[in-house]
Swiss-Prot record:
Major subcellular site: secreted
Superkingdom in the source lineage: Eukaryota
Signal peptide: 1-19
Disulfide bonds: C47-C62, C54-C67, C61-C74
Protein name as it appears in the record: U16-theraphotoxin-Cg1a
Gene Ontology CC terms: extracellular region
Amino acid sequence: MRALLIIAGLALFLVVCNASQVNEQRKLNEMLSVMFAVEEPQERDDCLGMFSSCNPDNDKCCEGRKCDRRDQWCKWNPW
């Protein structure tokens, strides 16, 4: 009877430890996702995102991007 109680206690201990570890891993994954989330700034539906092919004479790149005349794709424009 004592051996069965010890085995049940160990099994319960392992389940609690595993649940705690899974919860901790989930919190870490959420934190990393928030830290490394890259959101494309796109206010208009018709604007072109980063690295999209564009026409320099009719620049439809999203805010913060500019159509490059030489490469003809939307590049980041800090100014």
